[in-house]
C-alpha cells in the first residue's frame, strides 16, 4: 500500500507533467470507484477544467482545478498513475483515463480496484468526509494532546499508529521502522508509553517519512511511482521485510508476527515488551 512518502512522490511527478493541462475527456471503466455521485456526473463536473495544483491530505491526492473544483484520489492497496504524452491504448488494469486537450493522457491503474475518487468544491472539501476524518501528520501533531489521547487507549501502539484518524501518513512499513528506531515493541500498550517515548515516536516517524520521501518512497511488493519509477528507501529498511535476518543494532534475528492482520517485524531484544 502506498504510504505518505509514496503519495508525495507520485504528486511530485504529477506536478511536473500535468499542471496547467485541461481535461478534454474522462473514461471510467469501473464506476464503483467514483464515490457519492455517478460516473456521468463526475465526468460532467471535471471535463473541460484545468489542473492548476496538486497536494495531499494524509494519503489522499488532492487535484485543484479551475472553477473551484477539486478531485480527491486515494490509491489504496495497488493504485497508481501512468502519464503518456501521445495517445495510448488502455492497459488491462487501467480503471480511469484522463485525456488532455494537448493529446496527452493520465491513466489510473489498479489491479485490485480498491482506489477511490471523490468530487468536491474548494470551499468545503476539508469539512466533508473523508478528509474531515484525516488526522495531522506526525510533525504537525501536538505532543501533549497526542499523549493524552494515547493514555485513553489500551490498544497495541502499532494499531494506533496505523489509524489515519489518529495520525496520518504511516502505514505498515513506516510504523515498523518508527517503532524499531524508538525501541518500542509493536504490541506495547499505548496507554503505558511515557511522554518521552511518545515524543521519540513522533520524532522518528517524522524523520523516517521525510527521509523516505527524499528517496522516492519504498518500492517493495507492487509499489512504483508514476510510470513505474521505483523508490529506493527499501534499501535502508532496518526491520520491515527482514524476518530471520540479524538486527542491525544487536545481531538478534528479526521476528515476524501478525498484529491486526498485518505482518509485523521487530527485534525482541531492542524492542522489549516487558
Swiss-Prot record:
The family database entries (CDD domains) matched by this protein are listed as: EcFpg-like_N
EC numbers on record: 3.2.2.23, 4.2.99.18
Q: How is the cofactor bound?
A: Binds 1 zinc ion per subunit.
Classify the source by domain of life: Bacteria
Keyword terms: DNA damage, DNA repair, DNA-binding, Glycosidase, Hydrolase, Lyase, Metal-binding, Multifunctional enzyme, Zinc, Zinc-finger
What GO MF terms are annotated? 8-oxo-7,8-dihydroguanine DNA N-glycosylase activity; class I DNA-(apurinic or apyrimidinic site) endonuclease activity; damaged DNA binding; zinc ion binding
Q: Which reaction does it catalyse?
A: Hydrolysis of DNA containing ring-opened 7-methylguanine residues, releasing 2,6-diamino-4-hydroxy-5-(N-methyl)formamidopyrimidine; 2'-deoxyribonucleotide-(2'-deoxyribose 5'-phosphate)-2'-deoxyribonucleotide-DNA = a 3'-end 2'-deoxyribonucleotide-(2,3-dehydro-2,3-deoxyribose 5'-phosphate)-DNA + a 5'-end 5'-phospho-2'-deoxyribonucleoside-DNA + H(+)
Against InterPro entries, the record matches this protein to: DNA_glyclase/AP_lyase_DNA-bd, DNA_glyclase_Znf_dom_DNA_BS, Formamido-pyr_DNA_Glyclase, FPG_cat, MutM-like_N-ter, Ribosomal_uS13-like_H2TH, Znf_DNA_glyclase/AP_lyase, Znf_FPG/IleRS
Family classification: Belongs to the FPG family.
What is this protein for, i.e. what is its function?
Involved in base excision repair of DNA damaged by oxidation or by mutagenic agents. Acts as a DNA glycosylase that recognizes and removes damaged bases. Has a preference for oxidized purines, such as 7,8-dihydro-8-oxoguanine (8-oxoG). Has AP (apurinic/apyrimidinic) lyase activity and introduces nicks in the DNA strand. Cleaves the DNA backbone by beta-delta elimination to generate a single-strand break at the site of the removed base with both 3'- and 5'-phosphates.
UniProt protein name = Formamidopyrimidine-DNA glycosylase
| Organism for this UniProt entry | Mycoplasma mobile (strain ATCC 43663 / 163K / NCTC 11711)
Amino acid at each position: 500500500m502506498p504510504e505518505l512518502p509514496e503519495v508525495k512522490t507520485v504528486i511530485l511527478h504529477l506536478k511536473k507533467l500535468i499542471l496547467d493541462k485541461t481535461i478534454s475527456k474522462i473514461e471510467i471503466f469501473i464506476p464503483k470507484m467514483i464515490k457519492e455521485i455517478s460516473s456521468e456526473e463526475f465526468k460532467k463536473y471535471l471535463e473541460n477544467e484545468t489542473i492548476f495544483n496538486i497536494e495531499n491530505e494524509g494519503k489522499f491526492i488532492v487535484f485543484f482545478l479551475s472553477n473551484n473544483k477539486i478531485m480527491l484520489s486515494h490509491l489504496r492497496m495497488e493504485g497508481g498513475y501512468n502519464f503518456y504524452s501521445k495517445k495510448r491504448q488502455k492497459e488491462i488494469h487501467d480503471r480511469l483515463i484522463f485525456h488532455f486537450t494537448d493529446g496527452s493522457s493520465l491513466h489510473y491503474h489498479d489491479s485490485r480496484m480498491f482506489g477511490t475518487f471523490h468530487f468536491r468544491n474548494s470551499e468545503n472539501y476539508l469539512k466533508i468526509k473523508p478528509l474531515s476524518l484525516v488526522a495531522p501528520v506526525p510533525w504537525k501533531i501536538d505532543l501533549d494532546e497526542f499523549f493524552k489521547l494515547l493514555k485513553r487507549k489500551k490498544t497495541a501502539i502499532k494499531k494506533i499508529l496505523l489509524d489515519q484518524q489518529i495520525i496520518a501518513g504511516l502505514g505498515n512499513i513506516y510504523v515498523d521502522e518508527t517503532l524499531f528506531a524508538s525501541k518500542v515493541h509493536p504490541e506495547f500498550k499505548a496507554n503505558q508509553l511515557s511522554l518521552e517515548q511518545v515524543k521519540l515516536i513522533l520524532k522518528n516517524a517524522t524523520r523516517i517519512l521525510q527521509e523516505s520521501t527524499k528517496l522516492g518512497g519504498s518500492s517493495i511488493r507492487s509499489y512504483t511511482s508514476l510510470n513505474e519509477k521505483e523508490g529506493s528507501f527499501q534499501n535502508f529498511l532496518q526491520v520491515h521485510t527482514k524476518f530471520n535476518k540479524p538486527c542491525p543494532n544487536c545481531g538478534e534475528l528479526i521476528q515476524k508476527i501478525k498484529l491486526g492482520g498485518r505482518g509485523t517485524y521487530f527485534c525482541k531484544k531492542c524492542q522489549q515488551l516487558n
